[in-house]
Amino acid sequence: MTLAHRMGQSANCVSRFAAGLLAALAASAALAAAPGAAHAEQAAPAPAATPIPRAEGAGPPLWVVRDADSTVYLFGTVHVLRPGTAWGSDKVDAAFASASDIWVEVADQDDQAVVMPVIQQHGVDPSRPLSSILSTEEFAAFDKVAQANGASGAALDAYRPWLAAFMISMSGPTNAGYRSEAGVDKTLMDRARAQGKALHGFETADVQVRLIAGMSEEAQVAYLNNYVRNADGIVANLDATVAAWLKGDAAEAGRLNRVNTRDIHQDIHRAALIDRNADWTNQIEAMMQGSGTAFVAVGAAHLMDQDSVIDMLTARGFKVERL
């Protein structure tokens, strides 16, 4: 696979999978707007979306915040899934149908013309190759994992540590059948377009990538080395996270996510989750000051982990109810 092809894959995945494992990076994801400025798209009608297979039991959790004239539903997504994963539910369908506005992390995530330049600008730096940042032992371990996934340390040497980490983190799941096209975000965005709903992004691809790329080099290297050390367990961790999410086990899904963020380095937790959650909470609070019904679909880690959007809304006096 060529480096250009891998960059194209990165653009697709970074914009969808930013918070969950990059965490999400996803990471995860332009306008001349200040960080946190929302981007809205009046969704053009699209072909009718394929029905979502029904989850067993209650399915993934859904929350709601209400006042006299405003309703905001909060649904935690998984950015990549195996095709055919059964995650649908009547409660999510009803909430989605009732909303006039759909909010996702990044509304322009499918626009390669937007995402690719962002990745190239903030994810590639030939003047400071990985081989000059990592120790000899670290680079050798990285090269071994890269080769096991069809690349090499030399081919990825110009990548900044955060992007190299992301490539490692996604190679295993991709080989195991996970696809961003089957992810919840893509599915719900397609449905929004099919139904002519207004589609909004909490951030732009440029903002999302800048937040991750802006982590300290120390944190980026820790992030990369973590995925190299645990390469054999990446798919198992994602499988377990998806299983917990499908059962509605928010606590377990949050715990598993922390393995890839806060447990590695606090800077990762802050960049991937805390700072973004605070900005999104501000935007949701603004929605509550208006009127109408909105459906928010963001990476599950933003709703299920510590320092979550739900925690922040609760701290501001909002009653967040799980349905």
Question: What do these predicted regions represent?
Answer:
Residues A23, S70, S98, G290-G292:
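Short glycine/proline-enriched coil/turn segments at helix->beta-strand junctions
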Residues E56, R66, M288-G290:
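Extracellular/periplasmic catalytic domains that process cell-envelope and extracellular macromolecules
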Residues Q266-L323:
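A cross-kingdom marker for long, charged
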